[in-house]
């Protein structure tokens, strides 16, 4: 759709012929998909406003894509919200795209229990990158149940996922951890939010010991049951660092986190001392505590030694989240 907008901008005389694309579903895209003999890559990114639509503008597109399931290995979609229209077809047919290597969905799609069961049954032998935003963890867990053997990257913005949980976060995050270590032995990049319960930490440590190829973690420890004290927040950070040391992740090169847990100066130094024989670490955080002088001195010390490769603080959550550059 971006190309169409640019065409109208640079060639005003084209507007009369193309303006209908803004007021009704674009069935021409569906026809274009239908004539492709070996369609492997499909990407849709909405950036226009739809007005007065009475039918789903994407239905015919998905029906056409469904017929290309035997060849399609890259699917990326971002749809804008359209008042009065529920997008339901993608959820119904997603389990049929068994050849996918990359699946990216940057929008909320509600999945019924029946649709989740279909996802669990589908085997995605070739799936390597899974990026689903604005959805519950059980959607991702369902996809990897029989399709995680080749997965190298499971990426999402943790806070957006947590916002969708509505009281099911503790249960779903625990199940998510288990599905990862049961089904994703090759995982390298992983977004992972979980509760600071003893059971969650135990399962997370098990994940780290099984998934030895991990290179990067985006971590969120979120207590949905109560507001934690500062002592509890530091305690979660200390437990996490001890787990990382015990896990002996020789390939781990990067840790990303926000400010939902903190490392005391003493715990961080102990961790870095014990990390000396492993890979150089890059650390990215939005927590301004690490801008304090005593933390900066400690970080610079271990940069000079060669244990820390890079330490970046940013108030922009978008710079801590994974972005599409690593896809």
Question: Where are the predicted features?
Answer:
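The conserved beta-strand core of Leucine-Rich Repeat
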Residues: 1-327
């Amino acid at each position: 759709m971006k190309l169409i907008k640019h065409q109208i901008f640079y060639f005003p005389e084209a507007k009369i012929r193309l303006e209908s694309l803004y007021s009704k579903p674009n069935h021409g895209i569906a026809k274009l998909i239908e004539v492709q003999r070996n369609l492997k890559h499909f990407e849709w990114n909405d950036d226009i406003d739809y007005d007065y639509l009475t039918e789903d503008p994407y239905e015919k597109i998905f029906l056409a894509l469904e017929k290309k399931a035997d060849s399609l290995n890259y699917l990326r979609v971002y749809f804008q919200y359209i008042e009065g229209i529920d997008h339901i077809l993608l959820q119904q047919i997603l389990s049929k795209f068994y050849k996918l290597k990359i699946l990216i969905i940057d929008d909320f799609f509600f999945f019924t229990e029946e649709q989740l069961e279909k996802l669990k049954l589908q085997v995605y032998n070739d799936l390597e990158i899974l990026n689903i935003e604005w959805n519950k963890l059980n959607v991702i867990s369902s996809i990897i149940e029989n399709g995680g053997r080749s997965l190298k990257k499971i990426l999402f913005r943790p806070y957006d996922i947590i916002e969708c949980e509505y009281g099911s976060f503790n249960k779903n995050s625990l199940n998510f951890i288990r599905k990862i270590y049961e089904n994703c032995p090759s995982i390298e990049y992983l977004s992972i939010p979980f509760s600071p319960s003893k059971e969650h930490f135990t399962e997370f440590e098990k994940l780290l010991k099984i998934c030895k190829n991990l290179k990067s973690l985006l971590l969120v420890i979120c207590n949905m049951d109560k507001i934690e004290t500062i002592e509890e927040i530091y305690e979660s950070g200390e437990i996490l660092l001890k787990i990382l040391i015990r896990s002996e992740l020789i390939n781990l090169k990067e840790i990303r986190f926000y400010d939902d847990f903190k490392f005391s100066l003493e715990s961080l130094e102990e961790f870095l001392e014990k990390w000396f024989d492993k890979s150089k670490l890059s650390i990215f955080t939005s927590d301004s505590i690490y801008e304090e002088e005593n933390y900066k001195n400690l970080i610079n010390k271990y940069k000079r030694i060669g244990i820390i490769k890079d330490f970046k603080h940013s108030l922009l959550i978008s710079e801590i989240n994974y972005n599409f550059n690593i896809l």
